[in-house]
Every structure is written in structure tokens, then in C-alpha cells.
Regions:
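Membrane-helix boundary/helix-loop-helix interface segments in multi-pass membrane proteins
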Residues: 2-48, 52-53, 59-195, 379-392, ...
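Hydrophobic alpha-helical transmembrane segments
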Residues: 85-93, 328-345
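Transmembrane alpha-helix boundary/anchor motif
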Residues: 92, 100, 159, 264, ...
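Hydrophobic alpha-helical segments of polytopic membrane proteins
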Residues: 110-111, 117, 177-190, 197-257
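Hydrophobic, glycine- and aromatic-enriched re-entrant/interface helices and adjoining loop segments
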Residues: 130, 134-136, 225-331, 359
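Alpha-helical transmembrane segments of multi-pass membrane proteins, especially transporters
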Residues: 176, 180, 224, 362-370
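Interfacial segments of multi-pass membrane proteins
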Residues: 207-220, 307-333, 391-404
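Loop-to-helix entry and N-terminal half of a specific, functionally important transmembrane alpha helix
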Residues: 349-390, 396
Length: 436
């Protein structure tokens, strides 16, 4: 009991009963808060980025949920409080994840990877379905859904970082170095793709970048990319062949391309390629409303809470939240968001270069790559540079499990940063033996 009290006191600054906790409750709370801030270590710039994006999220989610509140007979304040609670939960995730020594994630990487495989299979057959794609499963106890691909991504990048760090001596060998790395990537991507092709492509792209940085044989990487591009090229060819330019609509697809989400993928490609500035219709409605929002924002925006497009733009609080940011805060506000994500990437690359251990360096780089690529994919869709992917803007879009997994990823990055900080200043930071 005495040891437990000692641990609590060292970790959170909670005084023991013997020291008069009932008589010094106010000082105890102040000490707890001060100790928590003091124990928040790692890259301070990344912590600041989390705070900035969270504040932006609160403002824009509150502004963009008016139509959603009307649809479900709720108030916009209810969504504001929900997002605030989610942000607080996310910060807690970040705090505890960054307090854990990052080597722990290497030890659990294989277990999490093996767990994610049956979860993805279960989700595909029995998961909650949206737009013909099963992406979520419902947790029975708390009655909440979460996207299993988020767990699979995190587990894969942990395992991939572990494999890259352990196989540097044989990394150029096809059998000993390449196959143990590429097989887990293929397994996860193949299981994610039927329900969420954009996420599978994001995972694959991040993995290939990490493999290149990890000194995997370039010929092996290019060969794999060439093979992976074959189904993408086939989809593009089918989208072009089975589109009637005269009538401006898709033709009947062959049976082989009419199952699952394949028609949705083809339709999005056709919409992206063939819809022009003056096209009006159900398929172009969302992107047209996003364009209207962006155009009306100008350089400086209409001001916080003054969006008009939020009442017409579907998913303005998630997939198309960047369009609302551009409308309310203008191109300067949008440029600031881009700068924040680039700053985050820069800090993580800097962390990669400073980290003395391969696993931590690869892990920080992988998690930062996937978050930044996702952010730019979302922003690209909003400005009609990419076809609609359905990915959200990390730390900004209203979300649930995806937001928490993003926070967990950032917490792991900060865990690596914390270790680097300790390596650089061993005298300034004392590592407690009873640390998590």
C-alpha cells in the first residue's frame, strides 16, 4: 500500500493521507495539475500543434453542424460538447501513450498485427455497412462503433517499423529482407481495400515510402508498385470505357465490376474525370457546394460562424470540413492549416534524424507520413484535385474512433520524442524506475 501511494505521488503529485490530504486538498489538486504539465514532455511544437488543431476543430465543428442538428432535432451545442469531450479523451490518450516507453510498442506490435487480421475479416462479413462497405464494428459493452482499419493501420506501422529495424543486415535480400516486410503490408491492404480502397491506398503509399527510407531494395519496391497499379489502371480504363459522354452518365457495367463497392469507385472516377464547371447533378452536388464555399471565402473569409455552404454541403463537419474552413477563414486560413501539417511533418522528420534507435525513428516517420498524407488527401478532395475518398482531416474533422486513434498515433510519436529528449539531456531528466 505504501509503495502504491509512493507511485501515485511521484506520477501525479497526489499527496498521501498521512501527509494530510484532507487538510491540503486544494494544494493537492494544484500539485497534481503542475506535475501533469511538468510530466508532459517530448516535442513542445507537436504539443502546440495538437492544441491549435483542436481549437480549430471546436470552432469549425460548432459552425458546421447546424444542418446535422436540425436533421436529428438536436442543438449545435450538443455536438460542440461531444467534440470537446472527444478532444479531452484524445489528449488523455496522447498523455498516457507518450508516457509509455516507445520500446513497449515494439513488443506488442506483432500481437496487435495478428489481432487486427481477424478483426478486419469479421468487419468485412459482419460489420456495420455504409455505402455498401463494411467499415465498423460495434463494441457490445459500451455500444460504440469503431473503424477496424484504424487499428490495423497502427498495428501494421508498428510491426513494419519493427521489421525494418531488425532486418537491416539482410534488407537487400529478397527472401530474408523483402518478403517478411511486404507480406504484412499486402495482407492488411487486401483486407481493407474491399470496404475502404482509399485507406488501403494510403497505407500502401506510406508503407512504400517507409520501405524506401528503410533501404529496402529499390527494384523490389518498384516491382511491387507496378503490380499494385494494375487494378488501379483497370479501374481507370473501365471508368473511361463505360461512360457515355453524350448523355453524361455511366453505362451498364459488366457483372465482374458490379459487385461490392467497385461501382462506387468507378462512379467517383467518372465524376472526377468528366464533370466540368457547369455540370449540375446528384453526383456533382457535393463538390459543387464545396467550390461555392471556397469561392465565397476569398482571401480573408466570411468570418467564424458565417458559413452559408454548411446548410447545403453534405458532411461539412467531416469529409468536407476544409471547404468550411476556406469559406469562413479564407485562403489565408486554409494556408495556415497547410502550414500546420507541414510543420508537424518537419518536426517528425527532425525527430527521425535525431532518434538514435531505428525502431523509434521508423515508427515516428510512418505515423507522421500517414497523418499528413491523409490530411492532404482530404484537402485535395475539398478543392477537387482528387476524387472523393471519404477520409477525414486529422484532429479537425468531427469523429469518433478515428480521432482517438489519431491521438494515440501522436502520443506514440511524442513517446519517441520524449526518449530523444532524455538521450540528449540525461542530467536534466531523471528516469524513474517505476515509470510506466
Amino acid at each position: 500500500m505504501t509503495q502504491q501511494k509512493s507511485i501515485l505521488k511521484k506520477l501525479f503529485g497526489i499527496p498521501s493521507i498521512e501527509e494530510g490530504v484532507f487538510n491540503t486538498s486544494i494544494r493537492g489538486v494544484e500539485g497534481m495539475g503542475g506535475n501533469l504539465v511538468q510530466k508532459t514532455s517530448g516535442d513542445r511544437v507537436i504539443w502546440a500543434i495538437v492544441v491549435i488543431l483542436s481549437l480549430i476543430s471546436l470552432l469549425v465543428v460548432y459552425s458546421s453542424t447546424g444542418s446535422l442538428a436540425y436533421k436529428y432535432s438536436k442543438s449545435t451545442e450538443s455536438y460542440l460538447f461531444k467534440q470537446f469531450a472527444l478532444i479531452i479523451s484524445g489528449v488523455i490518450f496522447i498523455y498516457f501513450a507518450h508516457r509509455v516507453n516507445y520500446t513497449f510498442y515494439s513488443r506488442v506490435a506483432k500481437i496487435l498485427f495478428l489481432i487486427s487480421i481477424p478483426l478486419l475479416i469479421y468487419t468485412y462479413f459482419f460489420g456495420t455497412t455504409l455505402n455498401e462497405g463494411s467499415r465498423w464494428i460495434k463494441l457490445p459493452v459500451i455500444n460504440q462503433t469503431f473503424q477496424t482499419s484504424d487499428l490495423a493501420k497502427l498495428a501494421l506501422f508498428m510491426y513494419l517499423s519493427r521489421q525494418l529495424s531488425r532486418k537491416q543486415m539482410v534488407i537487400k535480400d529478397f527472401k530474408k529482407g523483402f518478403l517478411p516486410i511486404i507480406i504484412p503490408i499486402l495482407v492488411i491492404c487486401v483486407l481493407i481495400a474491399p470496404a475502404n480502397l482509399s485507406t488501403a491506398m494510403l497505407v500502401a503509399g506510406t508503407s512504400f515510402m517507409l520501405m524506401f527510407i528503410g533501404r529496402v531494395n529499390t527494384k523490389h519496391i518498384l516491382l511491387t508498385i507496378s503490380i499494385a497499379l494494375i487494378p488501379i489502371i483497370i479501374l481507370l480504363m473501365v471508368a473511361v470505357k463505360y461512360y457515355d459522354k453524350v448523355e453524361g452518365k455511366s453505362k451498364d457495367l459488366p457483372a465482374i465490376f458490379s459487385s461490392g463497392r467497385v461501382p462506387t469507385w468507378i462512379s467517383r472516377i467518372q465524376t472526377f474525370i468528366y464533370t466540368g464547371k457547369g455540370d449540375v447533378g446528384e453526383k456533382t452536388y457535393q463538390i459543387n457546394q464545396a467550390k461555392i464555399a471556397i469561392a465565397s471565402g476569398g482571401w480573408f473569409g466570411r468570418g467564424p460562424g458565417n458559413s452559408n455552404a454548411r446548410n447545403f454541403l453534405p458532411h461539412s463537419y467531416s469529409d468536407f470540413i476544409f471547404a468550411i474552413i476556406l469559406e469562413e477563414y479564407g485562403l489565408l486560413g486554409g494556408a495556415f492549416i497547410v502550414f500546420i501539417y507541414l510543420l508537424f511533418l518537419y518536426r517528425c522528420i527532425r525527430l527521425y534524424r535525431k532518434c538514435p534507435f531505428a525502431f523509434g525513428a521508423f515508427l515516428a516517420l510512418a505515423l507522421s507520413f500517414t497523418l499528413v498524407i491523409q490530411a492532404f488527401a482530404n484537402m485535395g478532395v475539398n478543392v477537387n484535385v482528387f476524387p472523393n475518398t471519404g477520409v477525414t482531416l486529422p484532429l479537425v474533422s468531427m469523429g469518433g474512433s478515428s480521432f482517438l486513434f489519431t491521438c494515440l498515433s501522436i502520443g506514440i510519436i511524442l513517446s519517441v520524442a520524449r526518449n530523444v529528449e532524455q538521450q540528449e539531456s540525461p542530467a536534466a531528466l531523471v528516469i524513474d524506475k517505476e515509470e510506466i
